Amino acid sequence: MSASMAATSTSSATATTFIKCVTVGDGAVGKTCLLISYTSNTFPTDYVPTVFDNFNANVLVDGKTVNLGLWDTAGQEDYNRVRPLSYRGADVFILAFSLISRPSFENIAKKWVPELRHYAPTVPIVLVGTKSDLRDNMQFPKNYPGACTIFPEQGQELRKEIGALAYIECSSKAQMNVKAVFDEAIKVVLHPPSKTKKRKRKIGLCHVL
């Protein structure tokens, strides 16, 4: 499968398929930064809690136009009652944790998966570890000696545990694997793995214009 994206806040009348993609995870793990980085190729230098407006991007997939709807959610407990309203009609969840935050990693299985499976039991999940640039920075352990980082093997184990269809590590600040996150989200919706051949599924490359 090949895909190219033309980011636009206006839906195309020629779009044949709509995919609603919702980001979920603890507060301050970088969900909003991920969306801003993907749609504008910029990185906000200051933390601002969930100010990303719902955004539509027209994506060309194998010659057909797909309208990708991106929804941001707030991870703080104050939003526990209103957050599930965003789950209605979701086609895929991007479930994010920070690679430099053990609590956000542990909350994936403790809090977020139970919540998603309660409100949207059949919607596929793409597990995403954010802030890989900090995790891989040799100065980080020196600057934050008490921090407990998460490594790829742990992320893959969590993916298997929760039944996510993919695991990707990314850095919004460094623009590393940002596009790959959303490419994967599109793929799991358009080409869901069969129950018998899930592990044999081959995934093509996507290209952004």
UniProtKB/Swiss-Prot annotation:
A motif (Effector region) lies at residues 47-55. GO terms for cellular component: autophagosome membrane. It is a peripheral membrane protein. The modification Cysteine methyl ester is found at residue 206. GO terms for molecular function: GTP binding; GTPase activity. Keywords: Cytoplasm, GTP-binding, Lipoprotein, Membrane, Methylation, Nucleotide-binding, Prenylation. InterPro entries: P-loop_NTPase (IPR027417), Small_GTP-bd (IPR005225), Small_GTPase (IPR001806), Small_GTPase_Rho (IPR003578). GTP binds at residues 25-32, 72-76, 130-133. The keyword Membrane applies. Its main location: cytoplasm. PANTHER family: RHO FAMILY GTPASE. This is Rac-like GTP-binding protein ARAC9. It comes from Arabidopsis thaliana.
